[in-house]
């Protein structure tokens, strides 16, 4: 496993079938993406456990009943396995607003979802600048160019559903 990647929580949620606003094709794409990641990539998370804590709020530790839950259990069980998981140190700059030194200081990103900033911080702190996988979170779509200007690559797993959702806003 040599390729690294970061997985936004919404990919696993959609894989579980808990996103009624998307089609079955998107759910299948998320399932396939998680399987590909498990078979051939190292997953990047933060050393302090913020990403795993977010997963824990939305996914089951038991690994059931969905494939997103199975991904979470696999990652949880392998978080210390350097061949599967790469833990990256990120630097919080305050306690309550989820701000990180690694997040770009850019007015174009001022309204970017604070709860997703940890993923960006991990991508920028990691030496390989791994891509972030997104299913249907429109922030990743709306801010894709601004993030790219700072070296953050977003892989849109469900581009058609995402465009449709973004057009509704």
Language-model segments: residues:
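Well-ordered, non-membrane alpha-helical segments in soluble/globular domains
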Residues: 21-32, 65-74, 140
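Short amphipathic alpha-helical segments and helix-helix/interface helices
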Residues: 31-35, 72, 120, 124
């Amino acid at each position: 496993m040599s390729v690294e990647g970061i997985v936004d929580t919404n990919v696993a949620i959609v894989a579980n079938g808990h996103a009624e606003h998307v089609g079955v094709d998107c759910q299948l794409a998320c399932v396939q993406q998680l399987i590909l990641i498990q078979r051939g990539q190292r997953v990047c998370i933060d050393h302090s456990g913020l990403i795993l804590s977010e997963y824990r709020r939305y996914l089951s530790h038991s690994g059931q009943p969905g494939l997103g839950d199975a991904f979470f259990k696999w990652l949880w069980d392998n978080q210390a396995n350097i061949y599967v998981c790469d833990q990256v140190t990120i630097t919080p700059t305050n306690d309550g607003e989820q701000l990180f030194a690694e997040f770009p200081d850019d007015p174009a990103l001022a309204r970017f979802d604070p709860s997703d900033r940890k993923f960006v911080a991990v991508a920028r702190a990691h030496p390989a600048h791994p891509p972030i996988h997104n299913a249907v979170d429109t922030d990743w779509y709306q801010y894709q160019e601004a993030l790219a200007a700072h070296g953050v690559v977003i892989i849109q797993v469900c581009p058609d559903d995402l465009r449709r959702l973004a057009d509704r806003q």
